[in-house]
Amino acid sequence: MAEYGTLLQDLTNNITLEDLEQLKSACKEDIPSEKSEEITTGSAWFSFLESHNKLDKDNLSYIEHIFEISRRPDLLTMVVDYRTRVLKISEEDELDTKLTRIPSAKKYKDIIRQPSEEEIIKLAPPPKKA
């Protein structure tokens, strides 16, 4: 599934080295410390998760959980969008399934979007100096 590969690449492109350390820390129970040192890129992290059955194209709940507890709503939103668009699992459906651990992920969708014209606060120009 090409969309899955694209999702992982997009996520990898948005994960810095600092982010990676935080993500590895968030799932330290699932990554032995000696393996953690070998994981030095986002793609290596995703590969590790796939090889340990924590991630696949039809089950993204683990990384949704990690992105939420790591306070990365931008990454979480990318995963939720993929799940809704590609897997055709709506936010209502997810409440009835075990495909996600964190059904509250939908709360982040509004954070990422751009405000409408009505929502933009227009400031008055600064006062003129006399």
Curated annotation (Swiss-Prot):
Documented effect of changing residue 122 to E: Reduces MAPK1 binding
The UniProt entry, under InterPro entries, shows:
DEATH-like_dom_sf, DED_dom, PEA15_DED
- Compartments, record wording: Cytoplasm
- Tell me what effect the entry lists for residue 16 to R: Reduces MAPK1 binding
Quote the protein name from its UniProt record.
Astrocytic phosphoprotein PEA-15
Phosphoserine found at: 61, 90, 104, 116
Protein keywords? Apoptosis, Cytoplasm, Phosphoprotein, Sugar transport, Transport
Q: Entry's SUPFAM superfamilies?
A: DEATH domain
PTM note:
Phosphorylated by protein kinase C and calcium-calmodulin-dependent protein kinase. These phosphorylation events are modulated by neurotransmitters or hormones.
Q: Which portions of the sequence form the region Microtubule-binding? A: 98-107, 122-129
Chief subcellular site? cytoplasm
The segment(s) forming the DED domain are 3-81
Origin species, per record, is Cricetulus griseus
Q: Which GO terms describe its biological process?
A: apoptotic process; MAPK cascade; negative regulation of D-glucose import; negative regulation of extrinsic apoptotic signaling pathway via death domain receptors; positive regulation of extrinsic apoptotic signaling pathway via death domain receptors
